[in-house]
Amino acid sequence: MAIHRHCDGLVRRDFLQLGLRGALGLGMCDLLRLQASAAAAPAGGAAKPVNCIMIWLDGGPSHFETFDPKPDAPDDIRGTFKTVPTSVPGVHFSEPVSKLAGIFDRFTVVRSICHKDPNHGGGNHYMMTGAPTPVPVGCGAFVTFHPSMGSMVSHERGVRSGLPPYMAMPANTRSGGPNFLGGEHSPFIVGGHPNSDGFRVHDVVLPGDLATGRASSRRELRGALDRMKRAHDRVVEDPAVEFDRFYEQGFDLVSSARAQEAFDLGREDAAVRERYGRNDMGQRMLLARRLVEVGVSWVTVNWGGWDHHGGIEAAYKGEMLQTL
């Protein structure tokens, strides 16, 4: 049977025997170690503060049915819906995004971005990284020839407030990886269903039946066992010696009131949760906001299902546009 090691030397079986891995956020350990390695040689120059939420509408919503209806174009080009005035005089949006039209004075629509790649794989890469693919790729390709924007922000900012600088939910985008920047700048994935009553973030939030006091007792037990192992590790120069520091960081993360509050959507006012939409995507938007408020530099909310080749009118009258 293969032995899978974590954090430079600790065997997975050791985690299970101590009953710690699922309870104390130890899935973060590798990421914390890698980020610390990267921080040992920071890039020159002072980093500018960046907190960004990228809402990635995978597949691409139609511009004609959202922000650029082209009401004066021929019938076979212009959008199928009526137009509505925005809060900026002279600018109109399509009817399905009428709520966004009312606050257009608070955001900007950039209509000059374009690329010449005819499929989703290459287009996704261009938008996520700012660079075209060096070779043609297929429509469904999951490739990253260059670091994604989130990974670049992670590289420049590093860990803030004990939380990873780059997160994605509920999964990474196809070109959202770090490439040559290294695995330490991959996103921490926040999966699950945040609209459910029992939602918690795997490897970060303590289970409801595990109080911090009990976790502390297990931490002390682990410390006693590791003191015996550490002497041997130092003799053989086992990298697992470094595990202690990252274990402590993982424990601090799950025991931090600030981190727990950010992930606990139950602390949010019920009326606010309703405004975001009581569905998984609406609650992911809310969680993203809470994460950047506590210091996460970049959060990507990956929202699929926007590749409408037909039935667009029915789709845009449904929940997707209401949530957006």
Task: Label the model's feature ranges.
Residues 1-324:
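Ligand-binding pockets and gating/stacking loops
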